Amino acid sequence: MKNYKCRILITGVAGFIGCHLAKKLISEENLVVGLDNINDYYSISLKKDRLKFIEAEKKKSETFRFYKVSLEDNEKLRQIFNNYNFDIVINLAAQAGVRYSLQNPSSYIKSNIVGFSNILEFCKDFNIKHLIYASSSSVYGLNST
């Protein structure tokens, strides 16, 4: 495998922030591995367009790898962590939407709690030095003004 500045895992890579971050990191000669479950909460075609946006930046087939996987899938996550010696993990994946969380709480628990717990465990097991976690503005609740 080619020498890169860093080997970086980005979860939620088909989201707005994930795709722009991936494109920037690829342009800086990093190996970026992107994960996303491509669920239908947001437009699937929009997510696919974002992946094409990332692909347009990669200069060689080795600079970006995409895996369609849910973070609660321990086996697939373990394979991915085994295949790459990540320097950095950036967790942007989450099930969005406060109203949806009330209608389908199990989806939230699987994605946002079990999935993130798996990321934490694999970061510990694979001795990842840097984990970056971004959350949603929804955690702040309603504005009082």
Q: Which residue stretches match the model-derived regions?
A:
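N-terminal Rossmann-like NAD(P)+-binding domain of SDR-like oxidoreductases, especially those catalyzing
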Residues: M1-T145
